[in-house]
Amino acid sequence: MTKPIVAIVGRPNVGKSTIFNRVVGERVSIVEDTPGVTRDRIYSSGEWLTHEFNIIDTGGIEIGDAPFQTQIRAQAEIAIDEADVIIFMVNVREGLTQSDEMVAQMLYKSKKPVVLAVNKVDNPEMRNDIFDFYSLGFGDPYPISGSHGLGLGDLLDEVVKHFDEETEDSYDEDTIRLSIIGRPNVGKSSLVNAILGEDRVIVSNVAGTTRDAVDTEYSYDGQDYVLIDTAGMRKKGKVYESTEKYSVLRALKAIERSNVVLIVIDAEEGIIEQDKRVAGYAHEEGKAVVIVVNKWDTVDKDSNTMKKFADDVRNQFQFLDYAQIAFVSAKEGTRLRTLFPYINEASENHKKRVQSSTLNEVVTDAISMNPTPTDKGRRLNVFYTTQVANEPPTFVVFVNDVELMHFSYKRYLENQIRHAFGFEGTPIHIIPRRRN
């Protein structure tokens, strides 16, 4: 399933970022950042009235010295391309402008749901000034105040009404769903073509030539797969040249639909910050991961080269210490078959469930080897551990006081559980909970 994307659009200086920060800071439950993951905060994942969604702030687009009209068009184009619901924001103090009307025309042609928000309605008397905005053709305008936080609940109530009911993909549960992600020009499309043995995706040495993603079913050695080629990691002409951070939005959709995520990095260029950002999305979604080092044919090698590169990957991607690393050349078609055992193992472990009795024996043994911590004379007591979910495997540890479960000890228990049950390729989550 994929979360709906809500985009806040409008001309500059109408308060988009203020409203985004209001929604993120006060009205939405934000997914906690993962240590070691670098991420631009132009989107957040949250929920409103039990509806989960991704919300993006187009106020941060950097176009450099491009004309004013190009900025407006860039914001609207991104929203049209990626959003499921659009919050179109205008400013009551400046009234209806020609730029507002231009944005409205673009959004109207998109045929996507648009909720009109009139910002800076800071007192009840100003509500009388919103009626001019009816002429934009998007129904009732919603008066809000970013500075005072007024009207946001009514606005979000209307937004979630436009969410489609989420449906599961129709693929068989034994089919492994793969998304292939990475920064532009690391060879994602070439990897897809090499796996499938045909040019299913346009490939060019210019970053961003991949078409819109199309699922492709594939079988190998008796296992069925669905490849989701994430065209979302592309750029689209001049409009996207300085907005690379927005290219993750479509990749997020593909990640959410996946069992296993292949994170592709360029062996020739090495690891850069954008690789970490891309990898962070998969990790935070709790997906099984395989790291694919592509273009391995371009690297001068000796007997230690692969180990040195793997060590560097481990150092740079410490939050993905569970992921296997495959070295391939999509262009030459070499070492591709080494991918599939890693993919299969990661998928199997992602779905794995373990018996509570055996699990508690492992935890008891772990505590005997490394006793629980104390704080101000109080010791953490672990009463019982149980698995409450899979995909990813999630465990609740019942304790006397959650505050006594230090991060380091939780990580220790995680490592012991991982080692005992063989959870290679998948994250596992441990949730301490106070026993009543």
From Swiss-Prot:
**Which keywords has UniProt assigned to this entry?**
GTP-binding, Nucleotide-binding, Repeat, Ribosome biogenesis
InterPro entries in the cross-refs:
G_ENGA, GTP-bd, GTPase_Der, KH_dom-like, KH_dom-like_a/b, P-loop_NTPase, Small_GTP-bd
Report residues binding GTP 2.
Answer: 182-189, 229-233, 294-297
Q: Which residues form the KH-like domain?
A: 352-436
One GO MF term, please? ribosome binding
User: Its GO biological process terms?
Assistant: ribosome biogenesis
Out of the domains of life, which is the source? Bacteria
Query: Gene3D superfamilies annotated for this entry?
Result: 3.30.300.20, P-loop containing nucleotide triphosphate hydrolases
Locate the EngA-type G domain: which residues? 4-167, 176-351
Binding residue positions for GTP 1: 10-17, 57-61, 119-122
Subunit description: Associates with the 50S ribosomal subunit.
Matches recorded under PANTHER family:
GTPASE DER
What's the family? Answer: Belongs to the TRAFAC class TrmE-Era-EngA-EngB-Septin-like GTPase superfamily. EngA (Der) GTPase family.
- Known role: GTPase that plays an essential role in the late steps of ribosome biogenesis.
Q: What name goes with this protein?
A: GTPase Der
Q: Which gene encodes it?
A: der
